[in-house]
Amino acid sequence: MSSIARPPDPCLVAIILIVRSRAGPRFVFHYPPNPLSDNGLKSAKKARRASRTKSTRSSDSSSSDDSGPTSDEDEEEHQRLQQQQQQQQAQQQSSHIAGQPLSVTHLAGSAVSRRSSNFGLDDHVGMAASPGGESARAGSIGSGRTLLRKRGGNSDVEDDAGTSSDRQDDAGSSAMGGGRKGGPPPWESLLGLPAKVWEKLLSPSRAWHKRRFEVGINDLGRKKKKKPRAERQGGELGHNEHTDDAREEADAGEELMVASTETLSPHQMSASESQRASIASSKTGRAPSESLDVDDKDRMTMFNVVFVLDPPLLEYSMRSREIYDNIIKKFAKALKWEQARTGYVWREAQHISHIKEKAKEKGTSVNALYTELINQSSLARAIYTVYTSIAASKIASVSLSPDVSISLQIPPLTSTPYLPGPTDEAYPGLWLTTADSVTPVDDPTANESTAPHQVLAKHFALLLLDSEATILKDVEASGGALAPALAHYIRCSKPTKSFAQISASSGIPLPTIQMLASHLVYWRRARAIPPLHQRDTYIVSPNCDLSKLDVATAAYQLAFPTLPSLPKMLSALSGTPRPYGSFIPSKDHKDAYFAILAWLLRGGWVTQLRSFSRVKVTPEIKMAVEVALRREEVDKYLSKRGNVSSDAGNRGDSSEHDDDDASSSSSSSLASQDSGEETPMPGRYKQDSELQLTRSLLDRNTSLKTSSLILFPHRASPLESRWMDEIVSRFPDNPRPARPGTEGDPEQAGLQTSLKQFWPTYIKYFNGYDALEKISVRENLKRKHVWQVLTRLGLVTGSQASLDLDPREQVLVSVRHW
């Protein structure tokens, strides 16, 4: 995996709607009409697939014996289809697609993925189940939990799979009329497979009720995530939960793999192809069986909304989980609600099917049909909106009815702590910072591999990503219960004030502020940042997008016409790092220059240069601790031996008053001790075990001749704790004043107070991950006071040349980065 954190990449190829009634499944709608065209697969996706490993299986070999023509007319038609397929392969390179499906019965959500395919007209269709957990790669999917030991609703796919090549049209004809004479229209095939195959493949039987599973189709590697919910006779969704033994599930999955592959792929397949044709499932529930009602054949019993994905192989699990958690589950839940309330999905499915039948009779073109569908069907329009918005990493605002409106998105990545390496794809303009990463102070169990995230703690501030007037206008126009509170908070919020400070000044409770700020961050209207301060240092970001400098310069000039231009500001910030306050010419310009800084941060032009430190342990400290530990060992040993000798003397005195036999026995025992022939007794060497803890502090691998760094003071080992105790013990109790005549000056308290008082407060930040700039905000201390203490401890600053520093207090090693 690349070291750079990638922005959201939904890898969305298509969305499919399938419903099933008592009469059988029905392929209702899909968007885009032809995912293989330039409109469906963006150039970026083509470039991404082109960089992956191409499949070694050609389209000719995969389709040569599929249809098996039995007449001259069939043979001529078969040859024509092969020529069309070869032309299609020449126009677009073989594709690599992976993804994750999920179908939902009464409200289904599925994600389908594809990989290494030419999308030929003759691809076999296969399904298999594996007993493993959720796979991390496409084509070998293994969430495999199945209870379906019989083929059930999928068993009849065999009838259509064998003749699939006879029903398919060339993908390039999707913009034309209703297809060849006597054949199905072009909108009844998708990704090289006819609608009949998709209908039965993506409409699982009732045994799959509320289960999430993935489907792989041949070397297309299409995966479908499904969470079917079956509808009861009363119109409600079933919620029965059933759990079986894990071994039974694994065995059933293996049976299903074979049965499904044979059912959907009647032709011969190689072993590698069979492995690619996989389906993995995760059971979530089962609905009770129902008897069919003759008068109820047209009632919908299930629907699936299937998402076809195209993630890179190494990002398969992450991308599929993102779209499942953020899009599919929420979209399916809204459809379930409307279907249960008003029969929305079934009504819209019938409406869409009616429009398609009329278009088929009239020979309407695909483009005209889809324009009509999107205009007349709210469900088709909703699927269109979800696809176009999510595929572009935007927010999808969907209105199913006057009462049900939802907004869907995959939360964007707003920052990265890494610069791209030589082999990494660069994302210029992404905010370069570690400020929103989890640190040991935020979470003591965190480590450097913890993924970055927005930490909306009380010491953060809010940076609006658009003008305040624009956001307020949108908030007021949207209405809703949160609108008044949001508008009030936005007016009170400033990027120079933390949430806690805003709460104190505005009277808004801190939890409310954090909730509102989180809402604005999630919906891409703001960003959580450390509060802007004139004593902080800001530099030009190494990840800024200089290709947009001309456009940004014009926008900057409109926003700040009387202030230095954008090139001049960037040039000034590119020099020797210094506090931002040194760029402000006067107090009257303070607000304007902070507005400039906020504008630069918003566009990723600058980033904060922050300081990080760790405690250094010198050889002198190590040797002093070593000597002290050995002295303690000797003292304990001598003390224990003295106690043993005293006990022996007491026993000798008391033996003189015993009878002769006892005296003889005691004398014999003492003689035995003197001769060294001691009788083994429990606990005789107990004193040695008492020294075990002390000896454990003496790490033989620790060099006493080199300095060491304490990586995590909050998780220090016993030996590291002794080192830090020795360091603190050497701090002077009465430090000399920095300058003559400043004794008792409150402004010099950080220079005149013993560091022993400050050490417990500051030590937790000396871990190399928490910026020292946090201390003043988190501990509610004056910045000047904090930097005085840090300077005494060894932080390299520009003002330390004027101070008389004590070498005994110089214990920090510091670095500076973003």
Swiss-Prot record:
Official protein name in the record: Nitrogen permease regulator 3
Start-end of Basic and acidic residues biased regions: 230-245
Signal peptide range in chain numbering: 1-23
Annotated family: Belongs to the NPR3 family.
Source organism of this protein record: Aspergillus terreus (strain NIH 2624 / FGSC A1156)
Sequence ranges of Polar residues compositional bias: 260-284
Record-level GO cellular component terms: GATOR1 complex
Keywords assigned by UniProt, alphabetized: Meiosis, Signal
Chain's role: Mediates inactivation of the TORC1 complex in response to amino acid starvation. Required for meiotic nuclear division.
